[in-house]
Swiss-Prot record:
Gene encoding the protein: STR2
Lineage: Eukaryota, Fungi, Dikarya, Ascomycota, Saccharomycotina
Species for this entry: Saccharomyces cerevisiae (strain ATCC 204508 / S288c)
Pfam family, one: Cys_Met_Meta_PP
Cofactors required: pyridoxal 5'-phosphate
Catalytic activity line of the entry: O-succinyl-L-homoserine + L-cysteine = L,L-cystathionine + succinate + H(+)
Entry protein name: Cystathionine gamma-synthase
PANTHER family xrefs: CYSTATHIONINE GAMMA-SYNTHASE-RELATED (PTHR42699:SF1), PTHR42699
């Protein structure tokens, strides 16, 4: 089912959707310009940009109860996250800025039965003057350390239960009223105990399975006592129809059926804690990744990148403490901390992290020009902390030379952080060339566009590995802020991520060769795709492509000779249209408009043209998909 109404969720009627329908070029511009008719139509949005209605409702309740005059609030998943947010606010607005922090938690389960559907949920609420709220929202967006919509719904439900119990306690006369309140509490119990179909006790096992899939790129069969009995599901496959991705609610946590076979786990719990798994790199680069000590899960992909950046800054702080009597406890935010390097034109919030939480060299071309610029920086004697790079980049699908970066890293003692969200675990093996690999699990790993999460993998052979392991165990290091229901949903969605990735690779190859490549020089000025962007990109990508099942992925970008043809093409695409990528259904957006509307001239210097349309290919029937693009081409050309 295609979302066609401005502001509805993608997929339609999906409570926890991570994309929103902006079906025309004009609607996307209207969204960026803040047109009230567009903004008021939004039912959802990408979670770091659009505060979900459940989170808004929770904040309104807490604000009504705890805020002071002219204060606004936002919820965060832990006190440590809230404290980092407070630090960011004070750095950006001044030390005198008033920031209040309130810690809250829901009740713990009282017995073994309650553990099936109840979990103590701790959140921290940050209160600031309303005029400071946009700065706090920046932290939420850039850091990705957020409260999920499922977590907010759980807290709202617990608040409702508590409220009903309190009402019952306050009624001390009138049997009629007491009976009504008792009935309400009984109804709440039944809804909570039997209405929730996710077993909270399985959350830790679900997280282990996710980490293991990331470590091994293999989905193993779930044993008879595992998660396969907890829920079934149906997500996109060809039998659902060429563009039918379900009715909406079925993509959430309700009754779902699957013809994807469950798979078996041979080691769990205590036995799994010491297990390691072989990465499928080339023979001379083989090493083992332990899913329990080398793989970490986060509430978003940006949170994993933000944590990698924090880890590196804390490492640099050790250098500074040894070399000076520095009293300032502030970590990052510019000198005397070393600069990082952003290699290539990245997703917007990655660059924001490097700029707003420290300082950075932005080498936006991401090619030999940028490599020469990096070498000039290194040859000048400047010591850099780390190079951040996407593999490949979004939206230009450029691939930097990871082998050369690794050589320079060893020579000049800097670290490499790779975001391989676009390439994906199945298609590329970048860990041998990186110290840290980050990824958004919201994308192809999940596919169903109904949960947000991220991962960070430490290279056991990396130069910073020992420090990183220790840092992750410190008070300021790693916290597991991935809510249990999100983990259960992600585990379910990712059971077939390998097969889906292979199918997407095939669909994209067919679409490009059969329909789009013949239009280069006619309608399209250029197609950006790892095998097409440039000879250097193809060579660099091929050097890290997985030997088993690897392909070029499902993301490509199109540029046009004139913007009117771009608008006609986009408006006539009979597809879901909105932000995000890696969905099981094909998704398109005018990327420069939606991501860089306030800086179109600046990003054009790096090749991100205003007319650029980004497409993320899904699992639809390839013939149907080709016909959809062919019709849009004909409309754009006036045929």
């Amino acid at each position: 089912m295609i979302s066609r109404t401005i502001g509805e969720s993608i997929p339609p009627n999906t409570k926890h959707a991570v994309s929103v329908c902006l079906p025309t070029w004009e609607a996307t511009v209207g969204y960026e310009e803040g047109e009230s008719s567009i903004i008021n139509s939004l039912t959802t949005g990408y979670p770091r940009f659009f505060i979900h209605k459940s989170i808004k409702k929770l904040c309104e309740i807490l604000s009504a109860k705890y805020s002071m005059e002219d204060e606004a609030c936002l919820c965060f998943p832990s006190y440590k996250v809230a404290n980092r947010c407070r630090e960011f606010i004070k750095v950006k607005t001044g030390l005198s800025t008033k920031v209040r922090i309130l810690q809250l938690c829901t009740p713990k389960p009282m017995n073994q039965e309650e553990k099936l559907w109840r979990r103590e949920c701790k959140i921290t609420v940050v209160f600031v003057d309303q005029e400071i709220f946009p700065v706090m929202k920046q932290y939420w967006q850039h850091s990705g350390e957020i409260v999920s919509s499922r977590m907010a719904e759980y807290i709202l439900h617990e608040l409702q239960v508590k409220d009903n119990l309190k009402k019952m306690e306050t009624v001390d006369n009138g049997k009629k009223f007491m009976t009504e309140d008792e009935n309400r509490v009984n109804e709440e119990y039944i809804e909570t105990r039997f209405g929730r179909n996710l077993n909270f006790l399985a959350a830790d096992k679900a997280k282990y399975l996710i980490r293991k899939r990331i470590a091994t790129k293999v989905v193993e069969k779930i044993d008879s006592e595992g998660l396969s009995d907890l829920f079934s599901f149906e997500h996109y496959n060809e039998s659902n129809g060429p563009f039918n991705v379900g009715s909406g609610e079925a993509l959430d946590d309700d009754q779902l059926n699957s013809d994807i076979p469950a798979e078996t786990i041979t080691s769990m719990g205590e036995s799994g804690s010491n297990s390691t798994f072989e990465n499928t790199a080339t023979d001379d680069l083989k090493f083992h990744v332990n899913p329990n000590t080398d793989v970490y899960l986060f509430p978003s992909g940006m949170a994993s990148i933000f944590t990698a950046h924090r880890l590196l800054l804390n490492f640099d702080a050790k250098r500074l403490s040894r070399s000076s009597s520095r009293q300032d406890k502030l970590i990052g935010y510019g000198p005397p901390f070393k600069k990082t390097v952003m290699f290539g034109f990245p997703y917007t919030d990655t660059l924001s992290i490097l700029r707003k939480f420290n300082h950075t060299h932005f080498l936006g071309q991401g090619d030999s020009t940028s490599m020469n610029a990096l070498k000039n920086i290194l040859h000048s004697g400047e010591q850099i902390l780390a190079v951040f790079i996407e593999a490949p980049s979004n939206p230009l699908l450029k691939m930097g030379d990871l082998q050369e970066l690794k050589r320079l890293s060893d020579l000049y003692s800097f670290y490499i952080v790779v975001d391989e969200t676009v390439g994906g675990f199945v298609n590329i093996d970048v860990l041998p060339y990186a110290d840290i690999v980050c990824s958004s699990l919201t994308k192809i790993f999940s596919g169903d566009s109904n949960v947000i999460a991220g991962s960070l993998v430490l290279n056991p052979r990396g130069k910073i590995y020992e420090f990183a392991r220790k840092f992750m165990k410190t008070e300021d290091g790693y916290e597991d802020c991935l809510w249990c229901e999100d983990a259960l949903c992600l585990e379910r969605n990712s059971r077939d991520f390998v097969e889906r990735t292979i199918k997407v690779n095939t669909n994209t190859d067919i679409l490009l060769k059969r329909v789009l490549l013949p239009q280069v020089g006619k309608l399209f000025k250029k197609i950006y795709y790892p095998s097409l962007t440039s000879e250097d990109t193809k060579r660099n990508y091929d050097s890290v492509m997985s030997t088993k099942d690897g392909g070029y992925g499902g993301l490509f970008s199109l540029t046009f000779f004139n913007i009117e043809e771009a608008k006609k093409f986009f408006n006539n695409l009979e597809l879901c249209k909105g932000p995000s990528l890696g969905t099981n259904f094909t998704l398109a957006c005018p990327y420069a408009i939606i991501a860089h509307y306030q800086e179109l001239d600046e990003v054009a210097q790096y090749g991100v043209e205003t007319n650029l349309v980004r497409v993320s290919v899904g699992l639809e029937n390839s013939d149907v998909l080709c016909n959809v693009f062919q019709r849009a081409i004909e409309k754009a050309l006036g045929e």
